[in-house]
């Protein structure tokens, strides 16, 4: 994704994901900054440093209340790509640690199976509540 930094006359220059683009080779009234000599602003490097979100609901529920909370979250937001699934996939060798962070086909199958299980549990729980 690029950030467009444009002067008022809209001549358009900006920051790409890895480099600057557009602009002029010489400074002028139309281009107040010439891109080749421009440096990346200090705030431009902070995008990848944001901390991960803390989850309010445990991914490996132990108590009945935690199970209900997890199922409710799955019903609201869809099945999560659970940390538990990825850890289990690593243990069985379904996660290729040498490459970029991508699940192997076995890991994807395992994640899909876990998601299906959680959805089915939620459906069963709904049926049980309706029948009472």
From Swiss-Prot:
The record marks 23-24 as: Cleavage. GO terms for molecular function: DNA binding. One of its GO terms (biological process) is viral penetration into host nucleus. Keywords: DNA-binding, Host nucleus, Host-virus interaction, Late protein, Phosphoprotein, Viral penetration into host nucleus, Virion, Virus entry into host cell. Cleaved near the N-terminus by the viral protease during virion maturation to form the mature protein. The keyword Phosphoprotein applies. Induction: Expressed in the late phase of the viral replicative cycle. InterPro entries: Adeno_VII. A motif (Nuclear localization signal) lies at residues 124-132. Pfam families: Adeno_VII. All late proteins expressed from the major late promoter are produced by alternative splicing and alternative polyadenylation of the same gene giving rise to non-overlapping ORFs. A leader sequence is present in the N-terminus of all these mRNAs and is recognized by the viral shutoff protein to provide expression although conventional translation via ribosome scanning from the cap has been shut off in the host cell. Belongs to the adenoviridae histone-like nucleoprotein family. Interacts with the core-capsid bridging protein; this interaction bridges the virus core to the capsid. Interacts with host NPM1; this interaction might play a role in placing the pre-histone-like nucleoprotein on the viral DNA or regulating viral gene expression. Interacts with host HMGB1; this interaction inhibits host immune response. Plays a role in the inhibition of host immune response within the nucleus. Interacts with cellular nucleosomes and immobilizes the host immune danger signal HMGB1 on chromatin. In turn, prevents HMGB1 release out of the cell and thus decreases inflammation. Also plays a role in the wrapping and condensation of the viral DNA. May also promote viral genome import into the nucleus. This is Pre-histone-like nucleoprotein. The lineage of its organism: Viruses, Varidnaviria, Bamfordvirae, Preplasmiviricota, Tectiliviricetes.
């Amino acid at each position: 994704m690029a950030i467009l930094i444009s002067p008022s006359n809209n001549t358009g220059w900006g920051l790409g994901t890895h480099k600057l683009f557009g602009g002029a080779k010489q400074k002028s009234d139309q281009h107040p900054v010439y891109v080749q000599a421009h440096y990346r602003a200090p705030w431009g490097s902070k995008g990848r440093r944001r901390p991960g979100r803390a989850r309010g609901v445990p991914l490996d529920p132990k108590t009945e209340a935690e199970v209900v909370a997890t199922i409710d979250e799955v019903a609201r937001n869809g099945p999560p790509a659970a940390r538990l699934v990825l850890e289990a996939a690593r243990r069985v060798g379904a996660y290729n640690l040498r490459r970029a962070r991508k699940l192997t086909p076995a890991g994807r199958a395992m994640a899909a199976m876990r998601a299906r299980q959680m959805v089915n549990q939620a459906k069963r729980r709904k049926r049980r509540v309706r029948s009472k």
